[in-house]
Design a protein with these regions (language model features):
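Charge-rich, low-complexity N-terminal segments
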Residues: 1-98
Length: 98
């Protein structure tokens, strides 16, 4: 999956999650992406910035963390860790204004 398609497909989900969290304007998003998606962290962040234009994510800072299969990471929103499989698409952090 390329960066453009991944960002475009994730935007509606990110908007729903922002709404569930009561955020009217998102200022920062950190995503954990498995390496099996074959994307570059820099290119994916730039693509998210492009698809965020004219949305409540406009000008949000985007950070992409690429993880390898069998990597131990802290599970977002939980105290425990998880072993990655390389296909992750996880929201690690979302900040903004209510």
């Amino acid at each position: 999956m390329n960066e453009q398609r991944l960002a475009a497909e994730m935007l509606p989900e990110l908007e729903v999650i922002a709404g569930m969290r009561g955020l009217t304007w998102v200022t920062r998003v950190t995503l954990i992406v498995g390496s099996m998606h074959g994307v570059s962290a820099t290119s994916l962040a730039e693509e998210f910035e492009r698809v965020f234009a004219d949305t409540n994510f406009d000008d949000a800072r985007v950070e992409i963390v690429i993880v390898q299969p069998q990597e131990e990471i802290k599970a977002p929103g939980r105290a425990d860790t998880m072993t990655t499989n390389g296909w992750e698409l996880l929201i690690s952090k979302m900040e903004g204004r209510k």
